[in-house]
């Protein structure tokens, strides 16, 4: 969902399919760690900018997940927030980006910021836990930006192809 992980339980019924969201952390990357076609149970791996990889157990009959195990936190994320915005590229396309910063950060351009982006080989750049960035950069009141530029795999083949060959300049514009 706009580069933000979502997990849904889909259930077939007489009138079609119904969906119910699974309550997991926002602004995260969610992966299925284990599942079976013989069971309604699954394990999910969840990681975000402010939380290390965590294993969650869930059952489709009761989509309230249970935390099983988490990697240790390597920096203090208290007082930090993650927001997602969109910038407008040179051709009018909306380019999503995440910004991780102190909750009380002044939005006046004065906060030192590391910005990263990668638009190539259909590789998506999704939220991930970076202990060194957190410890040495975010804990000192600085901010971090991840831009989801074209050429990557965040929105499928068309997003990737929009930055290929003669259209390569567009990823720099993004």
Label every PLM stretch briefly.
Residues 12-15, 60-61:
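Short loop/turn segments that connect beta-strands within beta-propeller blades
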Residues 1, 9-12, 88, 152:
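Compositionally biased, low-complexity repeat tracts
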Residues 1-2, 46:
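Conserved beta-strand positions in repeat-built beta-propeller and related beta-rich domains
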Residues 18-23:
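A short beta-strand motif characteristic of beta-propeller blades
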